[in-house]
Amino acid sequence: MKILLSCLSFREFTGSELYFYELSSAFQKAGHDVSLYSPFVDLPLKDKTSGITFPSRDDIDKESYDLLIFSHGSVTWNYIKNVNAKKIINVVHSEVLDLEQPIQSEKIDLYVGIRPSIVNYIVDKIGSSNKPVKLIYNPFDTSRFNPQRGKKKKSIKDKIVLFPGSLDYLRYQPLKYLLDLSEKQNFKVLHVGRNDYTTVHPNFTTQEPVWEVEQYYKQCDIVSGIFLGRTSIEGLLCGKKVLQFDVDKEGKIKKVYWHQ
């Protein structure tokens, strides 16, 4: 099949960008002809791809595809709405970001939510539309994320909560919650990813985003994240308990609970 993928950005080791990396890699390994269109393609993520082409906007309007899969429709739909594709799938990664609102168009054949709460969100948004909505979780490389590779190093004695992901307004209140709790329960919080805030706390350490993020799963006892997203599932795959936060669109905490 000739497949076009489209997302807002393809450059960082984070969330939906890694989703499209995993998806494009899986399609390419299965023998498909895979292209990815994004207005923002750059290192370091682009360097991790192999056999994937990155066409321009003019190029995609001239081609015909068997399948088009896209996200971040509030922006990307304007670029791809005239693409000639036999089947179009809108994948939604968030129920709180305006960027991720499902596109309501007769051209869409299928909607996909990456967790149950997003499926409910899509159904509410598209209303009486008869288009199908499916739950398909994030794709993962289980050779990287598994209990054996995630086993904590015996040399690390501190109790550590790993808090991966971009530290933006959606994760700021959960971080404060963890740091307050760390003072009562004596643990360290290790953040890995982009950091939009200056946070100074004796129990807090932050690291730059890295490709080999699994090395940090070997250092922790517990993984924490927002929603049932990439970091939560990576933690579960590595055999960790996961403390999950659900937040609203302003980043206020709605619910705190365990997965294990």
Regions found by a protein language model. Give the residues of each.
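A short, glycine/small-residue-rich beta-strand->loop->alpha-helix junction that serves as a flexible
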Residues: C7-Y19, D168-Q173
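Conserved active-site histidine-acidic residue motif and adjacent donor-binding/catalytic loop
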Residues: P55, R194-Y197, N203-Y216, L228-R230
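Short acidic alpha-helix that forms the nucleotide-activated donor recognition element
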Residues: E63, P209-C220, I233, L237
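Short amphipathic alpha-helix
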Residues: S16-F27, L175-L179
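Catalytic binding pocket for nucleotide-activated donors in carbohydrate/polymer assembly enzymes
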Residues: R230-Q260
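Conserved catalytic-core segment of nucleotide-activated headgroup transferases in glycan assembly
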Residues: T142-R144, G150-V200
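Carbohydrate-associated surface elements
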Residues: S117, P139
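Short His-centered aromatic/hydrophobic patch
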Residues: F70-V75, V92, F227-L228
